[in-house]
UniProtKB/Swiss-Prot annotation:
A single active site specifically recognizes both ATP and CTP and is responsible for their addition. Disulfide bonds: none annotated. HAMAP family: CCA_bact_type2. This is CCA-adding enzyme. Catalyzes the addition and repair of the essential 3'-terminal CCA sequence in tRNAs without using a nucleic acid template. Adds these three nucleotides in the order of C, C, and A to the tRNA nucleotide-73, using CTP and ATP as substrates and producing inorganic pyrophosphate. tRNA 3'-terminal CCA addition is required both for tRNA processing and repair. Also involved in tRNA surveillance by mediating tandem CCA addition to generate a CCACCA at the 3' terminus of unstable tRNAs. While stable tRNAs receive only 3'-terminal CCA, unstable tRNAs are marked with CCACCA and rapidly degraded. ATP binds at residues 8, 11, 91, 137, 140. The keyword Translocase does not apply.
Amino acid sequence: MQIYKVGGAVRDRLLGRPVSDIDWLVVGASVEEMHAKGFRPVGADFPVFLHPKTGEEYALARTERKSGRGYGGFTFHASPEVTLEEDLIRRDLTINAMAEDDQGNVLDPFHGRADLEQRLLRHVSPAFAEDPLRVLRVARFAARYAPLGFRVADETLELMKQIAASGELQALTAERSWKEIERALMEDEPQVFINVLSDCAALKQLMPELEGDAAALAALTQAAEHHQPLHIRWACLLHNLKPASIKALNQRFKAPRECQELAMLVGECASNGHRALQLEPEDMLALLQKFDVYRRPQRFEDFISVCQMVARGSGQAYPQADYLRAAAAAARAVEAKPLVEAGLTGQALGEALRHQRLEALKAYKANAEN
């Protein structure tokens, strides 16, 4: 039995990046031997075990064969006879197909180290084209390592084009696709993810609504530079679309509720946000009510953040941000307690609250214009 570190842990150590998770590969062992040593099986599709002391995952070396469509269309074979090289050759990129033994020696049968030095994302073998999820994974790696100068190798981009043309991308589940999209959006240069998908003709199949949308990429770039959370980045990416298209993308990838809600609100309300300084008090009140700003003030603040990222993406300042925040504060300063104490309830209470909030917004607008 031989145990190796593999994949990202080896890659990131050689790049001088922090290593968070370690993938362990076991060569020359059977399932029975792993059980005998106290390892606990957890893999549903292929033999993966948890270390009895550390809880880390250890996978038996395996081969794979294409047996159906999509990410899950593979048959796996694990046995003590599977060699290290046979396991590594099934991996996606050469930089992910290196192993490290217990002496710290790097085993590199597919020249991943050279590709690290040349800053290339290159596929290991033609079998790369059998897994459509790899199109998204490579685009995500391109986004992650763009700050280090990495690019997708020309021949790998050609294979990605072949996958896109094959129709296999349609076999990807919403959950698997979103997992890659989510991780890519949280990289330092997420716009590279979209650009690579466009370069290999995958974007027009997965997210055709975004094809050629430079404003979306500019806003997303700003969101990343300002370290915004996922739901703000997603809303920035979709901000230039009509609500129907936003809804379609949300549903296509089953985006989390927070992402869906903010993206839809931006699509429906951004034009009023941009016109904030010209809005009549009645329209401002309607905008604040749309966001339920009295009970969910953070959602309105997130909306303002998206609008700011959009403006910065086009090289503009956004004085509307302070105006919107102050208007919200003026409306929220109106309290229901005095009205309740005066005996108002139900519809009468609601109408009185609305009237006082409207008066507060009128006073704020008049003061801001003087």
